[in-house]
A protein has these predicted regions:
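Predominantly a Rossmann-like dinucleotide-binding segment in NAD(P)-dependent oxidoreductases
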Residues: 1-80, 110-114, 236
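Acidic/polar loop patches that form or flank catalytic/metal-binding clefts of enzymes
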Residues: 6-7, 62-70, 97-101, 122-125, ...
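Active-site donor-binding loop signature of nucleotide-sugar glycosyltransferases
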Residues: 11-13, 102, 243
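NAD(P)-dinucleotide binding in Rossmann-like oxidoreductases
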Residues: 78-80, 94-193
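Residues forming the flavin
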Residues: 88
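Short hydrophobic/aromatic beta-strand micro-patches
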Residues: 91
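C-terminal helix-rich "cap/oligomerization" subdomain common to oxidoreductases
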Residues: 161-192, 196-197, 201-243
């Protein structure tokens, strides 16, 4: 396909807030701030991760066979019970791993899913894909660039045995001609949060009597991936997926 052979998938969601809401009376703490307590909430794996984990299944057209993970309360040491930082690794039958990371103590990188193939990379949240090999600039442009950066000033007879491989800076291509992306922090007040597409799909399904393809399956498996990931964290072991 366009991305070549998919050999890795990464997903993450970073926020910087405590999830707490004001409580008018102490006896209402667990009811109002239910997200913080294991009796009511699975924390990051169900609040955030389940929105992204199905991307791996969709890209690979298969389900993982096992998962390992770690979680801790790293920053918000305020009496909560659920983790504020998690890392998960899902292993697929073909050897591909999907890594997932989430925390609520830093929001710099926001959220993203990254599908990494031998020929290119896709970032759905940005609505872009990137090819591994970018067309080089014309010869004259390369020469001007080298002169401007004084490439020819010094000639080295010996050098390091390795060169740092920094991230690609190519601008990529839009997946669709018109695409709206939003910050992972909040969709309130955003120009588009996907609601129109969801309502449109619902109306189409209601009118035609045909549900959106794989909708229930993707929701189910995303939930299962999240819950088994939490089990792996809580039990400190690799969880093999049941048949």
């Amino acid at each position: 396909g366009l991305l070549g052979e998919i050999n890795s998938i990464r997903a993450y969601w970073f926020r910087n807030n405590d999830w707490r809401r004001p409580v008018p009376s102490p006896d209402l703490e667990r009811k109002i701030n239910w997200r913080l307590y294991k009796e009511y909430s699975c924390g990051l794996v169900t609040e955030l991760a389940t929105h992204q984990l199905q991307v791996g299944n969709w890209a690979l057209r298969m389900l993982p066979e096992k998962v390992a993970g770690m979680g801790d309360i790293v920053y918000w040491k305020d009496g909560r019970e659920v983790y504020d930082s998690i890392n998960l690794i899902y292993h697929y039958p073909n050897g591909v791993k999907m890594t997932y990371e989430s925390m609520i103590g830093n929001k710099f990188y926001g959220l993203e899913e990254e599908i990494l193939g031998s020929k290119g990379t896709m970032e759905p949240e940005k609505g872009k894909y990137y090819f591994e090999d970018v067309e080089p600039a014309p010869g004259i442009m390369q020469l001007i660039n080298q002169i401007e950066h004084k490439i020819f000033d010094n000639v080295s007879f010996a050098g390091p045995s390795w060169v740092p491989e920094t991230a690609s800076v190519n601008k990529g291509h839009l997946i669709m001609d018109k695409v709206t992306t939003i910050s992972g922090q909040s969709s309130v007040g955003a120009a588009g949060d996907g609601s129109i597409e969801l309502v449109t799909a619902f109306c189409e399904a209601a009118i035609t009597g045909k549900p959106a393809p794989n909708l229930v399956e993707e929701a189910y498996y995303s939930s299962v991936l999240g819950l088994l990931g939490l089990q792996a964290i809580d039990e400190g072991r690799v969880i093999t997926f049941p048949d």
